[in-house]
Regions:
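Transmembrane beta-strand segments that form the barrel wall of outer-membrane beta-barrel proteins
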Residues: 34-38, 126-141, 166-172, 200, ...
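Residues that define the transmembrane beta-barrel architecture of outer-membrane proteins
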Residues: 49-55, 109-113, 148-152, 194-198, ...
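Repeated loop/turn-to-beta-strand initiation elements of outer-membrane beta-barrel proteins
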Residues: 68-71, 123-127, 163-167, 175, ...
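Outer-membrane beta-barrel translocator/channel fold
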Residues: 82-84, 167-187, 239-335, 413-433
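Surface-exposed coil loops of outer-membrane beta-barrel proteins
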Residues: 89-108, 125-204, 213, 218-220, ...
Length: 442
């Protein structure tokens, strides 16, 4: 039994004695979510293609808080995945969709259970456990496959000051979206894990239309990072608006970074000091909304010294030197797209998207979008070769049933095409078909 599971069991025993307290039960929520997913990745340049289908279930119980100056509560999450289709030839080992057995074939099923104990004092909440899913500029939990990525540690959120939300925490382990095992934390290329990711920051809503953000984070022995953000929405009319969203990251090396086992692969691109973190990246997006139409245009620049860095446990190995299978990560840049990230040294990316909400045409719940990204000026890994380029086109259609017995049932179809010039990533065509449904008990 790991530490987080033990903590949840102890907490449940203590809180069960107060289960009758107003709020703990009355404010509880429980739901069961189902996700069926078909994943098809066609490597156009050769190599093993991936074609798999799987069924996932996720049960969430979120209690209220007990009475008193300090209220206590408990959250529990149980998830399970079942492999439906895709033989060994269509299941690349160490992928982030379905875990692998020792012979490289897909595991038929996997599951995990974890939870968080929580406390509330005034407008401040603390959560401690192994089912944390942060969504912050310096860390975004990934939920783009069958089951969600989760983290183990502690977080604090405070809204004691009007219009300001403070966030702080320390995380020690992660569980990948295609794994039931927890690992330490690392970056792309790092095989040795770190058990300390600390962060603190705030979102300040200066006016109802303007929000400023600052966050600092540190992954011990890998990197330190500062983030600055600005979000402004200009309401033009009742059904028109113009949104500005600007993000800036400044990242540098920490501790053992650069040593054997702690090297950052700089996303497969150039690095002024190989293995070390040294990066500044800014990204800006502008969105004009008119009724159900949304037109997005943006630009992003990664400096020449190294690639953009973020938490990524894809290369962490176990005691036998075998990958833990904890790959798959998200990051807080607009270029975190369906297939690629556009975050190598020197890369300049221009991107645009058009989306439409069909509610205005009498079809509520139906949405569609198409996006295109083009990155160039990517520095060659040796720093002296010709600059490289890449592009990606993503399309998406979503429909959610609005009423009746199947209210909330959703279908998503996504298709992405990626092509690169002299890039060490294979050209890919990718399709995902996803069915989602959540039933709420409470």
């Amino acid at each position: 039994m790991n530490k987080s599971t033990l903590a949840v069991a102890v907490a449940f025993g203590v809180l069960a004695q107060q289960a009758g307290a107003a709020g703990f039960i009355e404010d509880s929520k429980a739901s069961l979510s189902s996700r069926t997913m078909y994943f098809n990745n066609d490597n156009r340049d050769g190599g093993a293609d991936q074609r798999e289908a799987a069924q996932g279930f996720k049960f969430d119980y979120l209690s209220g808080f007990t009475q008193g100056t300090v209220g206590f509560g408990l959250d529990v999450q149980a998830i399970s995945g079942i492999h439906l289709d895709g033989g060994r030839g269509h299941h690349p080992d160490n992928n982030s969709f379905n875990p692998s057995d020792s012979d490289g074939s897909a595991t038929q099923s996997w599951s995990r259970i974890a939870g968080n104990v929580k406390a509330r004092l005034s407008k401040t909440e603390a959560h401690l456990g192994g089912a944390l899913q942060p969504s912050l500029p310096i860390l975004v939990a990934n939920d783009s496959r069958l089951l969600p990525q989760t983290f183990e540690g502690g977080t604090i959120t405070s809204k004691e000051i009007d219009n300001v939300t403070f966030n702080a925490g320390q995380l020690e382990h992660a569980v990948g979206r295609a794994s039931s095992n927890s690992t330490g934390l690392a970056v792309a290329g790092g095989t040795q894990d770190s058990n300390q990711f600390r962060y603190a920051g705030a979102d300040w809503k200066v006016t109802k239309d303007l929000t400023l953000q600052y966050y600092h984070s540190n992954l011990q022995d890998y990197y330190k990072q500062n983030f600055f953000g600005l979000v402004h929405v200009f309401p033009i009319d009742t059904n028109q608006s113009f949104k500005t969203d600007i993000r800036y990251f400044d990242s540098s090396s920490d501790g053992k970074n650069g040593d054997a086992g702690y090297r950052f692969n700089n996303n497969g691109g150039y690095a002024k000091t190989p293995g070390e973190v040294d990066n500044k990246t800014w990204s800006a997006m502008f969105t004009y909304t008119l009724g159900g139409n949304a037109f997005l245009l943006g630009h992003q620049r990664v400096n020449d010294d190294g690639g953009f860095v973020y938490l990524n446990q894809g290369n962490v190995v176990d005691g036998n030197g075998r990958p833990e299978g904890a790959g798959g990560a998200s990051f807080y840049l607009f270029t975190d797209s369906m297939i690629n990230g556009f975050v190598r040294a020197g890369e300049n990316t221009t991107f645009g998207q058009y989306s439409y909400d069909f509610a205005g045409l009498g079809v509520p719940g139906l949405k569609a979008s198409i996006a295109y990204l083009h990155g160039d000026n990517i520095k060659a890994t040796n720093g002296t070769g010709s600059d490289m380029s890449e592009w990606e086109r993503d399309m998406r259609i979503d429909y959610t049933v609005q009423q009746g017995t199947l209210k909330g049932f959703g279908v998503t179809l996504r298709n992405g095409v990626y092509r690169g010039s002299q890039i060490n990533i294979a050209d890919q065509d990718q399709t995902r078909l996803i069915f989602n449904y959540t039933y709420s008990f409470l």
